[in-house]
């Protein structure tokens, strides 16, 4: 049954119905639509539209419908209803007859769907906060296991300076904490209730919108009916928060994919998150990580989609907004499964400490320490930088590490170099000297890890 039609003499074409109907997407708002309808029954009863018995019967029927349908999406999608609101109202009328037709008094699908979607976002946001926290905890557990494993840090994907694997883990903890903060901000801003805004001008009945908002778990009501029914900022913000977080997950996935290559062999991934080849028996592919990386582009596309949909819409509601849900649902689903997979991957990561240490020792990652040594001897840093560059070039030509060069060879570049230089070129010294807040010294990483573990 359509919720409109008196104005029309002709029937909608089958093609238009297929094009117009949103139930295959918005069926996911079923629980929220019923919850909003129960609260709305109380609201219109408070202003005399329903008597106490009518209100009680409507609420009982809605609760019964909620229990009957549960999570059986096929019971909704196969109904042939135009949208989730039509489905609920039709089922309600089947249960209580004409009384069901009174429920929509003073309410529009415009404020109804805006409310449903915000309720859904609130519930989904809470689940995503839990999933983000689980990835953080997995990173902290990995950092604890591999706290002092020495590895090369990279810039431009070239070995730069030695760091620890624990430090690498905590870098992604910082990123995911910002993701948590962004999500919390978005959830805070959407925590206002549009119900009672009507189609665009506000309901004609003197309901208490503060009470209605509280009944649905919102912090308060929205304050402008035009904005209330046409606002989809929360969709944009959640898609944006997901996009930034997916960027972080994709970067982490790329790091681990590289670390897992035969060329690096820094880590091994567990069997339960990898797959093989139908042709090459030896292959163990990092599919989980590659799919995280791949789904990032999909999430970005959904963000661009909703921004493009909203960019030129006049006030207030327009049917274009029906396109808000599919991308949002897909985005939060994709984000959620990627968070789950990231946590699972991290749980099974094994670090090959011998390989990471050998890689840190190669590539002249201790060159900065030699420059700092020269600075301590009184040489200006820019001059020291140039001298060490020459030393590195010489070492490359000899096929030797800096610490393997004879003292006489080093002194040929800078006479101030003494035999006390060699301890400064060790990996342990390179790490220990980064004993500053945020640095990679074991002492700093240990303290940072302990602080994070107290939080999570």
Swiss-Prot record:
Enumerate the InterPro entries for this protein.
Arg_succ_lyase_C (IPR029419), Argininosuccinate_lyase (IPR009049), Fumarase/histidase_N (IPR024083), Fumarate_lyase_CS (IPR020557), Fumarate_lyase_fam (IPR000362), Fumarate_lyase_N (IPR022761), L-Aspartase-like (IPR008948)
**Reactions catalysed, as given in the entry:** 2-(N(omega)-L-arginino)succinate = fumarate + L-arginine
What keywords sit in the KW lines? Amino-acid biosynthesis, Arginine biosynthesis, Cytoplasm, Lyase
E.C. numbers: 4.3.2.1
**Which biological process terms from the Gene Ontology are attached to this UniProt entry?**
arginine biosynthetic process via ornithine; L-arginine biosynthetic process
Extract the PROSITE patterns matched here: FUMARATE_LYASES (PS00163)
Name of this protein? Argininosuccinate lyase
Q: What lineage, starting at the top, does this entry show?
A: Bacteria, Pseudomonadati, Pseudomonadota, Gammaproteobacteria, Alteromonadales
């Amino acid at each position: 049954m359509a919720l409109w039609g008196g104005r029309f003499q002709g029937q909608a074409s089958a093609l238009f119905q297929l094009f117009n109907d949103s139930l295959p997407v918005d069926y996911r708002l079923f629980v929220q639509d019923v919850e909003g309808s129960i609260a709305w029954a109380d609201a219109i009863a408070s202003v005399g539209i329903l008597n106490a018995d009518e209100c009680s019967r409507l609420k009982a029927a809605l609760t019964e419908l909620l229990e009957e349908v549960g999570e059986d999406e096929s019971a909704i999608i196969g109904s042939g209803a135009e949208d989730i609101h039509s489905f609920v109202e039709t089922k309600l009328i089947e249960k209580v007859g004409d009384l069901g037709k009174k429920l929509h008094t003073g309410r529009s699908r415009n404020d109804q769907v805006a409310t449903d979607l915000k309720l859904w976002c609130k519930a989904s946001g809470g689940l995503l906060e839990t999933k983000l926290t689980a990835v953080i905890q997995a990173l902290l557990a990995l950092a604890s296991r591999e706290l002092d494993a020495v590895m090369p840090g990279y810039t431009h994907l070239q070995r730069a300076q030695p760091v620890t694997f624990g430090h690498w883990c905590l870098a992604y903890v910082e990123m995911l904490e910002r993701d948590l903060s962004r999500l919390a901000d978005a959830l805070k801003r959407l925590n206002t209730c549009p119900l009672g805004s009507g189609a665009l001008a506000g309901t004609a009945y003197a309901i208490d919108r503060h009470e209605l908002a509280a009944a649905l778990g919102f912090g308060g009501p929205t304050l402008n009916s035009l904005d209330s029914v046409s606002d989809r900022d929360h969709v944009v913000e959640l898609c944006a928060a997901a996009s930034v977080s997916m960027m972080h997950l994709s970067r982490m996935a790329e790091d681990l994919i590289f670390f897992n290559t035969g060329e690096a062999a820094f880590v091994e991934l567990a069997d339960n998150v990898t797959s093989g080849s139908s042709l090459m028996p030896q292959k163990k592919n990092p599919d989980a990580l590659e799919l995280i990386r791949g789904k990032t582009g999909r999430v970005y596309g959904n963000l661009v989609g909703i921004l493009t949909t909203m960019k030129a819409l006049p006030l207030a509601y327009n049917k274009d907004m029906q396109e808000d849900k599919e991308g949002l649902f897909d985005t939060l689903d994709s984000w959620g499964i990627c968070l789950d997979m990231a946590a699972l991957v991290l749980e099974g990561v094994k670090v090959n400490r011998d390989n990471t240490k050998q890689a840190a020792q190669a590539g002249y990652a201790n060159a900065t320490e030699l420059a700092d040594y020269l600075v301590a001897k009184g040489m200006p840093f820019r001059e020291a930088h140039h001298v060490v560059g020459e030393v590195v070039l010489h070492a490359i030509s000899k096929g030797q590490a800096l610490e393997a060069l004879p003292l006489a060879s080093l002194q040929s570049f800078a006479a101030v170099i003494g035999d006390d230089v060699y301890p400064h070129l060790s990996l342990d010294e390179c790490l220990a000297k980064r004993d500053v807040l945020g640095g990679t010294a074991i002492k700093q990483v240990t303290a940072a890890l302990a602080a994070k573990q107290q939080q999570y």
